[in-house]
Amino acid sequence: MHFSRDFDIIVVGGGHAGTEAALAAARMGQKTLLLTQNLDTLGQMSCNPSIGGIGKGHLVKEIDALGGAMAAAIDEAGIQFRTLNSSKGPAVRATRAQADRVLYRQAIRKRLEAQPNLLILQSTVDDLLLLDDKITGVATHLGITFSARAVVLTVGTFLGGLAHVGDRNFQAGRAGDPASIRLAHRLREMNLSVGRLKTGTPPRIDARTIDFQFLREQPGDEPIPTFSFLGNTAQHPRQVSCWMTRTNEKTHEIIRAGLDHSPLYTGKIEGIGPRYCPSIEDKVVRFSDRDSHTVFLEPEGLETSEIYPNGISTSLSFEVQVELVRSIAGLENAHITRPGYAIEYDYFDPRALKRSLETKAIDGLFFAGQINGTTGYEEAAAQGLLAGLNASLKIKEQESWCPSRDEAYLGVLVDDLVTRGVTEPYRMFTSRAEFRLQLREDNADMRLTEAGHQFGLVDEKRWQIFAAKREAIETEKARLRRTWVPAGVLHKLQTLQTSDQSDDRSYSLYELLRRPGISYTELVSLSEVESSMIDGRIAQQLEIDVKYEGYVERQRQEVVRHTQHETMVLPKNLDYSTVRGLSNEVTQKLNQHQPETIGQAARISGITPAAISLLLVHLKRGMARQAAKQEETHESGKTVA
């Protein structure tokens, strides 16, 4: 019997990073093996049943633009879709979807099993095979060895995973799945800097025991958004609502009383948790002035009664979990189906990675996902795709690729990781990107699909649809530039009827569209204007492109100014809490590090471009006040004289 053991690329781990890595490598023609501990958990959502959100939705769109699976899978599995920040500018609008966990796993597995060049095997990897600091393959728990020219590790929270519930702890990669202990030991023997991080999940609740009568309903958006550029609403399953409730003072008293047995506060948990997804006990302690916190009740699927109570992640004892859940309005008789828990795991300093996500120490070994100190399905999937791409390019002896910070949130993510490192689980926000006005969800394909096609990540069907869209936008922009509206017609535009602007000259449609408040639809409705044949989504992107043109250029100039301020000296012992607008995280980190210059401040993990802008404003105000005071002193001196 012949069983192939020789591959171009081996991917270890079948989560969000691993599935994207394996698909990317196989799409590029590499003979690929995906090894996973359990075939039934491919694409598993280990924590919250959702995809997208602020910054994260942008990453999903970029994955889709590069031919990845996540966006298309959530379009087939999403049971509620919303556009966050819909009242704000296009740059910070973000798509978010609740997922049916089972449908999502099925959508991912369907794509894996249909992908040419890709084999999947259920087996646990215990060892990495090396020859002179070069990866040559892996060995499994059954003693089977597989050779490869590149290996991508996407092991999530499984390396040395230790789960905590109250005073109890046990080895696990997540509840119900064993930790990777031998592989963790093997990696610790290598020339890699290792640390511990922590994440957590809330207890699950049986919806049949929830009283929804007095809870606030949160339906999805109409019209329903889609994630994939090739998606349509006909792919969506039945849509459902989420619900909202709040903790209360009784809840907080129960939590405070249970802290004596909280592994977070007894020192049993050493790993640092995600700042922007704190446990409920962390919220109660850190924000003691708050008398309540929001809890979102999110369905886990269409064929299950389980509910995910987003906002009460906890590692308190099971008894305390029951008490705290039942103290919340609507949950007085709630039955917990699975207890919440925290989990600690190994990660490796991402500053030891190249921008390709290949380790500097071991040739051919790539890391992607939580092993690099990130948190979130979307961050993991984006890294996985990039690692799979670069592993393939390495085998082809081609130059590695990573988008720059002005090309993609993926570029921001990787640059932050490999230059700044992490001190806590890293998640993506739009505020991390200095070029966020041009890194929008709507134009992710315009930024990345051509590159994806050149690498072989994007198939011909997607390429033809994209090329037609791009041509339609450019053709319509040209038409807007050459089409002029004569004087005396502007009064027909509803937006300008109350405007003081003169109507005594002609304007091109392009000029008019750049004005705030004038929509593309309104412009082309003028009887003097030839009608357009482009569809709604293309029209929306065209309008955003035109209106944002000037803002994008100004943002570029601002980034250049920031670079010029690299050597600007910061005052010694500056109390950063006096700088208006800084977040608690930024204030805390700046006070702790006390950087000497703006450049040093900008390179601290977690310090965003927006924070640097606020710092510069603060310094300029201080200099202006000092100059005014000196002038005042000078004038008073002249008066005395």
Curated annotation (Swiss-Prot):
<feature type="binding site">
    <location>
        <begin position="13"/>
        <end position="18"/>
    </location>
    <ligand>
        <name>FAD</name>
    </ligand>
</feature>
<comment type="similarity">
    <text>Belongs to the MnmG family.</text>
</comment>
<dbReference type="InterPro" id="IPR047001">
    <property type="entry name" value="MnmG_C_subdom"/>
</dbReference>
<keyword id="KW-0285">Flavoprotein</keyword>
<dbReference type="GO" id="GO:0005829">
    <property type="term" value="C:cytosol"/>
</dbReference>
<dbReference type="InterPro" id="IPR044920">
    <property type="entry name" value="MnmG_C_subdom_sf"/>
</dbReference>
<dbReference type="Pfam" id="PF21680">
    <property type="entry name" value="GIDA_C_1st"/>
</dbReference>
<feature type="binding site">
    <location>
        <position position="125"/>
    </location>
    <ligand>
        <name>FAD</name>
    </ligand>
</feature>
<feature type="binding site">
    <location>
        <begin position="273"/>
        <end position="287"/>
    </location>
    <ligand>
        <name>NAD(+)</name>
    </ligand>
</feature>
<feature type="binding site">
    <location>
        <position position="180"/>
    </location>
    <ligand>
        <name>FAD</name>
    </ligand>
</feature>
<dbReference type="InterPro" id="IPR004416">
    <property type="entry name" value="MnmG"/>
</dbReference>
<protein>
    <recommendedName>
        <fullName>tRNA uridine 5-carboxymethylaminomethyl modification enzyme MnmG</fullName>
    </recommendedName>
</protein>
<comment type="subunit">
    <text>Homodimer. Heterotetramer of two MnmE and two MnmG subunits.</text>
</comment>
<dbReference type="InterPro" id="IPR049312">
    <property type="entry name" value="GIDA_C_N"/>
</dbReference>
<keyword id="KW-0963">Cytoplasm</keyword>
<dbReference type="Pfam" id="PF01134">
    <property type="entry name" value="GIDA"/>
</dbReference>
<keyword id="KW-0520">NAD</keyword>
<dbReference type="InterPro" id="IPR020595">
    <property type="entry name" value="MnmG-rel_CS"/>
</dbReference>
<dbReference type="InterPro" id="IPR026904">
    <property type="entry name" value="MnmG_C"/>
</dbReference>
<dbReference type="InterPro" id="IPR002218">
    <property type="entry name" value="MnmG-rel"/>
</dbReference>
<dbReference type="InterPro" id="IPR040131">
    <property type="entry name" value="MnmG_N"/>
</dbReference>
<dbReference type="GO" id="GO:0030488">
    <property type="term" value="P:tRNA methylation"/>
</dbReference>
<comment type="function">
    <text>NAD-binding protein involved in the addition of a carboxymethylaminomethyl (cmnm) group at the wobble position (U34) of certain tRNAs, forming tRNA-cmnm(5)s(2)U34.</text>
</comment>
<dbReference type="InterPro" id="IPR036188">
    <property type="entry name" value="FAD/NAD-bd_sf"/>
</dbReference>
<keyword id="KW-0274">FAD</keyword>
<feature type="binding site">
    <location>
        <position position="370"/>
    </location>
    <ligand>
        <name>FAD</name>
    </ligand>
</feature>
<dbReference type="GO" id="GO:0002098">
    <property type="term" value="P:tRNA wobble uridine modification"/>
</dbReference>
<keyword id="KW-0819">tRNA processing</keyword>
<dbReference type="Pfam" id="PF13932">
    <property type="entry name" value="SAM_GIDA_C"/>
</dbReference>
<dbReference type="GO" id="GO:0050660">
    <property type="term" value="F:flavin adenine dinucleotide binding"/>
</dbReference>
